[in-house]
Amino acid sequence: MYLLLYVDDILLTGSSNTLLNMLIFQLSSTFSMKDLGPVHYFLGIQIKTHPSGLFLSQTKYAEQILNNAGMLDCKPMSTPLPLKLNSSVSTAKYPDPSDFRSIVGALQYLTLTRPDISYAVNIVCQRMHEPTLADFDLLKRVLRYVKGTIFHGLYIHKNSKLNVQAFCDSDWAGCTSTRRSTTGFCTFLGCNIISWSAKRQPTVSRSSTETEYRALALTAAELTWSSASRSRDPSAMNTN
């Protein structure tokens, strides 16, 4: 049985309906609660049940982001970022940095069901301190991509295999201003992706081999955490 609690929202799941109902009864006898039945919407995430699994999406939340940014009717883009990021563009300051940060912060929450925008959101996050007009143009491109993929999300398949797998990669000195590298990884439980990240490395690597080892170390740490968090699961789990 698993219990997810956020402020006054509770999500319960488990393999025994008897235990779930018992816990709900015990909680209800102590606290004022309302049982909403099978989950359909939780913390901005829409959950649709299918015979073969669950589909998680944030379509309504994405629409809200676009509306707040004044880009609900914008022209969609097929990719979140250009092929090459140009660091030598105009450095004119964006007049409303708080607006820039608000949009980027909202996009960070959208990555909960959208691993495809993790890298792009990481790039614009790095420019929140003193955003320029060019940075805002880059942010608008991410929003245009969200517009064109607004119904995308995560499909969680039913799967009896609980082996953990991970994939990682990194560039080398991809950030032209700091010469720091970026690591990306994703981990899977069976055939389902369960965690992902795109993050600039904290220090400069002196070779591509060094940056790859840093990426591997970060991924290994994620695997260790994932395995530890499931240590109480009775099912056998292999780590590859």
UniProtKB/Swiss-Prot annotation:
Pfam families, per the entry: RVT_2
SUPFAM superfamilies hit by this protein: DNA/RNA polymerases
GO cellular component: mitochondrion
Record's keyword terms, sorted: Mitochondrion
Subcellular location field: Mitochondrion
Other facts: A stretch of 270 kb of the mitochondrial genome is duplicated within the centromere of chromosome 2 resulting in the duplication of the gene. The expression of this duplicated gene (At2g07683) is not demonstrated.
Protein name, entry field: Uncharacterized mitochondrial protein AtMg00810
Species of origin: Arabidopsis thaliana
